[in-house]
Amino acid sequence: MRVLHVCSELFPLLKTGGLADVIGALPAAQLAEGADVRIILPAFPDLRRGIPETVLVREIDTFAGRVALRYGHYRGIGIYLIDAPALYDRAGSPYHDASLYAYSDNYLRFALLGWMACELACGLDGYWRPEVVHAHDWHAGLTCAYLAARGRPARSVFTVHNLAYQGLFSADHLSELHLPAEFFQIYGLEFYGQISYLKAGLFFADHVTTVSPTYAKEITQPAFGYGMEGLLQALVRQGRLTGILNGVDSDIWDPQSDTLLPTRYDAENLQAKAINKTHLQTAMGLQLAENKPIFAVVSRLTVQKGLDLVLEALPELLALGGQLVVLGSGDATLQEAFLAAAAEHSGQVGVQIGYHEAFSHRIIAGSDVILVPSRFEPCGLTQLYGLKYGTLPLVRHTGGLADTVVDCALENLADGSASGFVFNECEAQALVKAIRRAFVLWSRPKHWRHVQRHAMRLDFGWQLAAVDYLSLYRRL
């Protein structure tokens, strides 16, 4: 089966969020299952540098000007790059300028991505033509609309990685996009008077997926639907909405083989994990104390991630004898609050603003608990990394967090299914209660190690998701 993924990021070459991790792993897993998989992306500078050897497929005139389609390979996967320097050759983020303002021509930049993907489905590359086009998030949403406008030359799947980002643009741009005027309506890509690239994907795709089963249910409710819940409820009735859990790339995230760690370890050698803890305490200026559990945050610092709750719960966490490590950037108010906490609690709280992939590995390996108290979480990867590394996740019961972490309640400890700590209400006191339960288990090292070993043996590999997606493609 020939599959084309349409997206804007690819780990490790270009990453702003979890989408890049998915595209860096899912196509390779599908290839291993026998599929013929390729990816199409804009030729952003980081991607051009990472894939320097390409051949010209075609040069064509488009509504966005003269464009070259180039083809190369990265880690065994065929990659199409859309070479349009005026649109894509910009330093920094693929989405906004240095002042964090979204590029004013994003509507054109990402419409071209969808249009070129559709052209491939129509035979632009005389040597390869996809049977299934799989578009990811709003950046690729117009792909499904272009395919519908061209009579659906390939089947289409649209994956929502985060419904909060809707790709909204002025309706004045519609005439530039080479889409039928009748597509701009409530049964189409119109959303409260604007064009929504996300809605285009939801409405025109043959099938829609989200990145966890629980998130697929949540987004049909007003609290999580961002105004799209009516359309999503219709997709459920039509049997066109499925939740497929993201996975972990074990080539990158495995404590047995992770070369970024001071010391590698596995479920049978947890003593070596303690060496990583000592290194982390030293690196973050924390008191060297093996008996103090380290709670870690590796995240964008936003209210969506529930990190205001962590700040509220911090006095209790420290009073109980814990330490806190934070790696991330985002909301200026949260950044300043965490830095102030580190200054006030020197030796017990360590904060590094920014994101460093290598250091994130060392934090997850060296910590005892990974905090993911999100208000909503489509899937979440951090808790999966925690499980893999024996760093027990403490999460709120939402989205993919609910699908992947089993609470250390007595009955789950008894039957051996417990893998972390789960709380329900989105409030600081609920988080505090979960932290207290973590300390209770911490006080019983034998039970803690038992849960650690179980967590590390859980299989959240990409092969499971790859099989599920290929099965879905065949049903279309």
UniProtKB/Swiss-Prot annotation:
Record: residues binding ADP-alpha-D-glucose: 15
Keywords, comma-separated and alphabetical: Glycogen biosynthesis, Glycosyltransferase, Transferase
First-level EC class: transferase
InterPro entries, alphabetized: Glyco_trans_1, GS/SS, Starch_synth_cat_dom
Keyword Mitochondrion: no
GO terms classed as biological process: glycogen biosynthetic process
EC number: 2.4.1.21
Coiled-coil regions listed in the entry: none
Pathway: Glycan biosynthesis; glycogen biosynthesis
Catalytic activity: [(1->4)-alpha-D-glucosyl](n) + ADP-alpha-D-glucose = [(1->4)-alpha-D-glucosyl](n+1) + ADP + H(+)
GO MF terms, alphabetically ordered: alpha-1,4-glucan glucosyltransferase (ADP-glucose donor) activity; alpha-1,4-glucan glucosyltransferase (UDP-glucose donor) activity
GO cellular component: cytosol
A UniProt-annotated Pfam family: Glyco_transf_5
Keyword Ribosomal protein: no
Family, as annotated: Belongs to the glycosyltransferase 1 family. Bacterial/plant glycogen synthase subfamily.
Function as written in the Swiss-Prot or TrEMBL entry: Synthesizes alpha-1,4-glucan chains using ADP-glucose.
HAMAP family for this protein: Glycogen_synth
NCBIfam families found in the cross-reference section: glgA, PRK00654.1-2
Protein name listed in UniProt: Glycogen synthase
Gene field: glgA
